[in-house]
Amino acid sequence: MNNNTYWYEFRQNNSGGSFVVDDKVCHRIYIEAEDFREAVIIAERLGCYWNGVKKGIDCPCCGDRWSKWDKDPIDLEKYNTEGMNAEVYDGVYPDTKAEWNKKYGHYEIIERPKFVNDYGRAYKGRIKIKNIEEYAQFMADSYGWTVPDARIYYKDGTVKEVFSKRSD
């Protein structure tokens, strides 16, 4: 990102029980643009569409495949200073701490992880996210629904694919 561009995130819902993955779209796409309007135009060129249920394209019970719900750019400065929660729920993996370290141990740690009981027992800490690549990797490792899990579209035309490092 330069001083005149921002990062926008578009997420795909698995409408009809599956995700669309091709050479342009996957679960999440990140677009560098001067404003939200430009990001939407780029997303549409890549194959994103809006109001799919209303148009009869998407499953009415699952909902629209794509949405433009978040017009604000990704706040990388906030995630670089305040960090993001990084958690692994206990009982999902054979070794919860090892799984947390596999997913998040390579990030700069702001708050060391510990077991907490919020919405179930989780091993939770805070990590620093320094750039769009780290943000996309964090989201891929947290959700990891498709292969690739994300694509980053840079303003200069460069495209980077991001793959989950999850073990499940």
Can you annotate each of these PLM segments?
Residues 1-26, 109-111, 117:
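Short aromatic-glycine-(Arg/Gly/Cys) micro-motifs in beta-strand/loop hairpins
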Residues 15-17, 36-38, 134:
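Generic "edge-of-domain/loop-turn" microfeature
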Residues 20-22, 41-43, 164:
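Generic alpha-helix signal with a bias toward terminal, lower-confidence helices
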Residues 1-4, 31-42:
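A short, structured loop/turn motif at beta-sheet edges
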Residues 45-168:
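Short, mixed-charge low-complexity intrinsically disordered segments
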Residues 22-34, 120-130:
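A short, exposed loop/beta-hairpin motif centered on an aromatic-Gly-Thr core
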